[in-house]
Every structure is written in C-alpha cells, then in structure tokens.
Amino acid sequence: MIRRILFVCSGNTCRSPMAEVLLRKKLARHASEWAKDTVVTSAGVSAISGSSASENATAAMKHKDLDLSEHQSRLLEAADIINADLVITMTRNHKKAVLALVPQALHKVYTLAELTALAELAHAKPEQAKKYRDMIQEVAQKTMELTLLLDQLLGNPPDIEDPFGGDLAEYEECARSISGHLDTLLQYLDQSQNQSQDQSQDPPQESSHSRDQSAED
C-alpha cells in the first residue's frame, strides 16, 4: 500500500511544493479510505533548506485557494527516499539524482510524466494494468536499461519544466500541467490501491496436498 508520497524537484521552491499542496487537496476531496491516510511531502535535490516558496508559485497556488506562505524548502536526504513508498520527480535528471543517493529505490522512483503515461495505459487497458506494473518493476531492476526501456514503453514523456525566473503566467501554466498529471495519477493510485485490497482479502488457496489428504479422510 502507498502511504507516503514524496515529490522532488531542484530547489523545493516551485514545482515540488506546488505538487505537494495540489495532491493534498485532491486527496482530501477523494472518497477512498486509502487517500485519508496518505502523507505527501516534498524536497529538492539542490535545495537551500529553509527557503520560502517562490513568489509566483505562492501566487499561482493562491489562485487555487492553496497556501504556500508557510512553506520552507528542504534538501533531499537519503532517509526521505527510503521512508517514501513512492518518489515522484519533476524531471529525469531529478530521478537520476534520487537514485544516486539511494540506488535500491529504483522500483519506486518515477517522473510525474512517466506515472501519468503508465496510468493512461492502465486506464485504456485495465485488464492489463497489472501486466504493465509488473513490467515496470522488472525493468526497474535493470539499472543500465531503465531510461531507454521506460522511454520505449511510455513514449518518452516530457519533464515538468521549471518556471523559476518566469512570470506568473508561466507558474500558472506549470501548475495546470502538474494538476492535470495528478488527476490522472490519482485515478491510477485509486485503481492500484483497490486491487491491492482485493488481493489481500482473497482467501488462501488450498494446496493439492491438503485436497488429497481430505479425499483420503
């Protein structure tokens, strides 16, 4: 089960804090029980800890009735990655930086666009959703081939562009892009969590030895 989601960008002042508060809002409105228990955080691979969210990121979120005025940036640490169930980066370079810190986290680190592409595949062919997830897991074990194979599978999805230094319109566009990805991601997480719950509730399979023993009794 996914309980802890970590967003990662560069300075933790623009993209990842916007993604953090946007997803928190979407989870709060979501009806599923799992959403209520999910913890969302963010950090930056090159952040200066204690910095405020950028002025335009704060303004863009204010337009969505979200408050970033109290946000303080955090430098990404290995413990953040280890403790997270899912690590979502804004770009492939951020993903590489995460894996440089914790290589064994390969199976749970994706760019936001990669996850969206996977979610769309699962939505289009729900009967093959598990197949796609298993395929991603298998690919994740092959570090050297990961980027190439994911690009082939997901169509080389684009990164979330950094609006730092841009005007408010660029921040608004970045927020719209992140929000759209998160809507698709939320559908995928809901489907994935429901499948996990169904599997955990399946009765244990009776072994052939037990059936044979019962037949002899």
Predicted regions and their residues:
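Short polar/charged helix/loop
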Residues: 1-196, 202-217
